Each structure stands twice: as C-alpha cells, then as structure tokens.
Regions:
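N-terminal Rossmann-like dinucleotide/flavin-binding domain of flavoprotein oxidoreductases
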Residues: 2-3, 22, 42-112, 191-217, ...
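A Rossmann-like FAD-binding core segment of flavoenzymes
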Residues: 92-95, 99-106, 113, 174-275, ...
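Glycine-rich dinucleotide-binding loop and its adjacent helix/turn
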Residues: 47, 122-177, 181, 210, ...
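FAD-site-proximal beta/loop scaffold in flavoenzymes
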Residues: 135-151, 237-314, 382, 407
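Beta1/beta-strand and adjacent pyrophosphate-binding region of the FAD-binding site
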Residues: 2-15, 151-161
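Rossmann-like dinucleotide-binding cores of NAD(P)H-dependent redox enzymes
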Residues: 72-79, 146-147, 152-156, 162-224, ...
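Flexible, glycine-rich terminal cap/loop adjacent to redox cofactors
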Residues: 10-36, 41, 45-48, 52-53, ...
Length: 456
C-alpha cells in the first residue's frame, strides 16, 4: 500500500464514508482508516437497529422475532458498506486505529502514513455517569442492547432523551415492564415542553412508568435474584432485570493524538471547528459527532461531504450550517423539529401558528389526532407579494411528524415566506395540509385560528 495520500479519513462511520466518497469523486487519492467494521454507529448500534426494533414492536412481533429482525436488517444494510465495496469505488481502506503525528503524519499500527489533508470522523461513545454500583450492574447501552436474543421481562431505562424514549416505548410494546428515569423536569429536554408532554403521555399509555426529576443515585443487586434495585433522587426505588443507559455521548478520541497535531477542544470536550469544519491544526478537518454539532446521521453525512470538499478545494470554501437541519424522535407520535422553538423565536420578534392534529381532516380520518404542528415565522411582511414572514422553525408532533417537518426545513433553506406555503395547493386530505393551514394563519385567519406573537 502506498504511504502518501491526498486525503486520509480517520473513521469509517457516516461522516467518514461521506468524506471519503466526496474526495474520491473529485479525483483525489483517498485512504479510509477504520478501527473495526465499516459503517459506524448508525449501521450497527444506532439508526438501523433502533428503527427496526421500533417498527417490529409496532407490528406486534414477539420479542425474539423482533431482535432477530434487527440482526437480519443490520446485516443487509452493512453488506452495502463493506471495505470491499469502498475499494471497488477506488477508496483504499486500512483497518486499525489511526493516530495523528503532526505535520500530516498518521500512524496506523506499524505503518507510518502521510497526507496533504486529514479528516477526523471518529464519532462518539456513550457516557456512563458516575453512580455507585452502576459499573458492576452489567448495564446496557445502545452499543450492546441490540445484541440481546430477546428483551428481558423488566427494564429500567436511564435518560429521557430521544434514544431513551424510543427504546422505552419499543421495549414496552414487546411486553417488557419498563421504567423510564429522567433527571430533568421533562422528557426530550431539547424540545418544547408541550411536545415532551405529548410523548410522555403516549409512553404512559403504552405502559411505561415515566419518572421525572428522578436522577439515578445508586444501583445495588437484589439478593440472589440477579435483579437490580435503583435508588432515585426523588426517594423512590425501581427494581428491574436490566438497566439501559441513554445518558448522552462524548467524543470518541482515545489514542487519536490530538495534542501532537495541535487539535484543540472546546469547553464541552468536542473537537473545535470553524464554519469550514477546519480544526485548529493546519490541514486537519473534522466532521460528525466528534465536533459536538448536531448528533444525527444526516448531519454527519453533510458535514463529511463539506469537510472533504473544503479540505481538497484549490480555491474557495463552503460553510456548514445547522440552521435548517431537521431532526426526528421516532416515538409514536413522532416529533419532528427544525430551527427555532417558540421561546427562541420570541427573542427575534417571531410569530407562531398552531394547528392541533384534531383539526386536520387526514388525522381525523386516520384516528390519529394526538399532537400538533407549530410553525414559527419572523415578523410579518406584506411587500411585493411576499405575505407573512420568513419561516424560522417548526415543531411537528404526530404520527407523520418526521415527514412533515421537511417542508418547513425546505422553506427555511430557501428563505421562503409563509404566504408561499399557504398559496401552494396541497392534496386533500393529506397530512401535508397541516403545513399549508398553519402557514395561512401567519397572514390571515384560517379555521378560526390566527397566528400570535411568540412568547418565552
């Protein structure tokens, strides 16, 4: 194998694959360094297995059948992302752990390599809180839970973010007794309180015991039973067969040699990058979870492509922005989100349109009226046919929330005024009409509803 490359990508997850392919399409010599199987968290321990389990649980499959489907689906997706597939695309692959040496040098095992440019894409890892007794409890994380042959009879899920909520609901639907423990005052702390409350109610309806303001204080084994007792900060106790941690993630950078290369971290411990995704070290870029930006596969893909494009460009560069990047929590109902919340929009003179799903005919006919759509826009303008204000954000909570949010994301990306959305004919009765109806509220009364000023 050659030792001198145009670009070396360290990390073979979503961001790394996107970076390698982007550079290769530009005709550059690319080496991908990956410690383990190509594909990363999304394929093996994240999006693919979790969404498969969620779907299997919703379809009423048995626990064993559901976990079997997870393994089969992961294998199917992974087959399209192997090292051999990458080599067929002209990308060289070297298995091992890459370590920066400075001045474009990279050490992989006994091999010393050199590159004009380097992209770091090593992802993130689960965070384990310092709780007495937790280390000896054989706890699970997203990296280990999908290896189970079947779900245990009872499960304590610690952490009420997207991963915790999704897996708690899926496990409950598979017949497991689930307690979801969250230290804060609401589930989904990055979402609006109303969205979090809708999800909490849905989880309780599925049998999940939701405990809020209840930080985990201690884990102890029950005498001879193999079960665990969890003592919580609110004074209550939970007993369960297994504990699943969903308590956040940290940058995966052990042994990466950041100091040797002059790569600095921010206050939260993520690799510091600028708008180009360049690090503090000359010739080194970073993409994906490692940067501490949006921790989503689609964001990692976009960052990987942007970092590689900027790293290999002869002139000019493209900025990476998270402003119009949507994300989805795949509970039932789904929570789709892009841009500002109402509280954030209040600081910018924003206005809010609100549509309960009970007022959307498609939701009524489907019998799925739980949730709402909230569309956020800037100050109202009426000039040269531009009605309403520019779209600044949206929260969509409904069974199709993960699909509807993308119309708002496109409107944000295009700088569209809400009047354009309202004047675009939407098929009736469709879920997408929710966007049209909400957009109309931002410059006229629709169905007895009119937009109001955003409040903090």
């Amino acid at each position: 194998m050659r030792t001198d490359w145009d670009l070396i990508v360290i990390g073979g997850g979503t961001a790394g694959l996107a970076a390698a392919r982007q550079a290769r399409r530009g005709g550059h010599g690319v080496l991908l360094v990956q410690d383990g199987e190509v594909g990363g968290d999304c394929t093996f321990t994240g999006c693919i297995p979790s969404k498969t389990l969620i779907a299997a649980a919703a379809q009423g499959l048995s626990s064993a059948h559901a976990f079997g489907r997870v393994r089969a689906t992961v294998a199917q997706v992974a087959a399209a992302e192997t090292a051999d597939v990458l080599r067929s695309e002209g990308i060289a692959v070297l298995e091992g752990r890459g370590r920066l040496l400075g001045r474009g040098g990279v050490q992989v095992g006994g091999a010393r390599l050199q590159a004009a440019r380097i992209v770091l894409a090593t992802g993130s890892r689960p965070v384990t809180p310092a709780v007495p007794g937790l280390a000896g409890s054989a706890y699970l994380t997203n990296e280990t839970v999908f290896a189970l042959a079947a779900a245990p009879s009872s499960h304590a899920v610690v952490g009420g973010g997207p991963v915790g909520c999704e897996l708690a609901q899926a496990l409950a639907r598979l017949g497991t007794t689930v307690t979801l423990v969250e230290a804060g005052p609401q589930l989904l702390p990055k979402e609006e309180p109303e969205a979090a409350e809708v999800v909490a109610t849905a989880l309780r309806d599925d049998g999940v015991d939701v405990r809020l303001r209840a930080p985990l204080r201690e884990v102890t084994p029950l005498d001879g039973s193999g079960r665990l007792r969890l003592r919580l900060g609110d004074g209550s106790v939970v007993e369960a067969d297994r504990v699943l941690l969903a308590t956040g993630r940290a940058a995966a950078m052990d042994g990466l040699g950041l100091d040797a290369a002059g790569v600095t971290l921010d206050e939260a411990g993520w690799v510091r990058t600028d708008r180009r995704l360049a690090t503090s070290a000359r010739g080194v870029w970073a993409a994906g979870d490692l940067t501490g930006r949006l921790p989503f596969t689609h964001a990692a893909d976009a960052m990987g492509r942007t970092a590689a494009r900027n790293a290999t460009a002869r002139v000019g560069w493209l900025p990476y922005s998270t402003r119009a990047v949507p994300w989805v929590t795949f509970t039932t109902p789904e929570v789709g989100r892009v841009g500002l919340t109402e509280e954030q929009a209040a600081r910018h003179g924003g206005r809010v349109a609100y549509l309960p799903m009970a007022e959307l005919d498609r939701a009524v006919t489907a019998g799925e009226t739980r949730g709402y759509l909230k569309l956020i826009a800037g100050p109202r303008l009426v000039t040269r046919g531009a009605l309403g204000g520019r779209v600044l954000g949206a929260t969509v909570v409904c069974s199709r929330g993960g699909e509807l949010v993308h119309e708002a994301a496109l409107a944000m990306r295009a700088g569209m005024f809400t009047g354009r959305l309202a004047q675009t004919t939407h098929a009736y009765p469709s879920w997408s009409m929710a966007v049209q109806l909400a957009a109309g509220q931002l410059f006229q009364e629709v169905g007895g509803r009119r937009a109001r000023p955003a409040v903090a």
